[in-house]
UniProtKB/Swiss-Prot annotation:
InterPro entries assigned to the protein according to its UniProt record, in alphabetical order: ATP-dep_Prtase_HsIV_su, Ntn_hydrolases_N, Proteasome_sua/b, Proteasome_suB-type
Swiss-Prot/TrEMBL keywords: Allosteric enzyme, Cytoplasm, Hydrolase, Metal-binding, Protease, Sodium, Threonine protease
Lineage: superkingdom: Bacteria
Active-site residues, as the UniProt record annotates them: 12
Primary location: cytoplasm
Compartmental location: Cytoplasm
GO MF annotations in UniProt: metal ion binding; threonine-type endopeptidase activity
Record note on quaternary structure: A double ring-shaped homohexamer of HslV is capped on each side by a ring-shaped HslU homohexamer. The assembly of the HslU/HslV complex is dependent on binding of ATP.
EC nos: 3.4.25.2
One GO CC term on file: proteasome core complex
Binding positions for Na(+) per the UniProt entry: 166, 169, 172
Listed name of the protein: ATP-dependent protease subunit HslV
């Protein structure tokens, strides 16, 4: 089994949808190294801080947990200010020699804002309340955008979009974890 940098990015799809006063983040459970499925029920979506922030990650698991811990520290430093906490984390991520090597991306959300954080220092907010990361991210994003105008609620859109991504992306499965917040 090989474990190269490119291979570590395969193995997940994380999607968030903000609709009808709710924000939902969902992720599949597959962890792959190369062409081998290592685990099918990993939990890549969770509540952060005091439960008022939800997040999901794609990339190297240990790196993502390190970033979640750093984000929780920033949330303690800047309570109720998710955007500020994320910008401060992104600054550290870009400038710290140790953090710069971490290979992960994150989607985080609170009742007001949804953000994608990348190792290049990007902190991005979607225009339409929908965004996705990971190997099946583009498939899930397209499906969610198509379903956003329907009568389906945010959780249904996330679940259905992740199922569609799992049907297309070999690094994504149907073991979905969902976290939600009501505005």
């Amino acid at each position: 089994m090989q474990n190269s940098q490119a291979e570590s990015w395969h193995g997940t799809t994380i999607l968030t949808v903000r609709k009808g006063g709710r924000v939902v983040i969902g992720g599949d459970g597959q962890v792959s190294i190369g062409q081998t499925v290592i685990k099918s029920n990993a939990r890549k979506v969770r509540k952060l801080g005091k439960g008022d922030v939800i997040g999901g990650f794609a990339g190297a698991t240990a790196d993502a947990f390190t970033l979640f811990e750093r984000l929780e520290a920033k949330l303690e430093q800047y309570p109720g200010q998710l955007t500020r906490a994320c910008v401060e984390l992104a600054k550290d991520w870009r400038t710290d020699r140790y953090l710069r090597r971490l290979e992960a991306m994150m989607i985080v959300a609170d009742k007001e804002v949804s953000l994608v954080l990348t190792g290049t220092g990007d902190v991005l907010e979607p225009e339409d309340g929908v965004m996705a990361i990971g190997s099946g991210g583009n498939y899930a994003l397209a499906a969610a955008r198509a379903l956003s105008d329907s009568e389906h609620d945010a959780e249904t859109i996330v679940r259905r979009s992740l199922e569609i991504a799992a049907d297309i992306c070999v690094y994504t499965n149907r073991n979905v974890t969902i976290e939600a917040l009501t505005a």
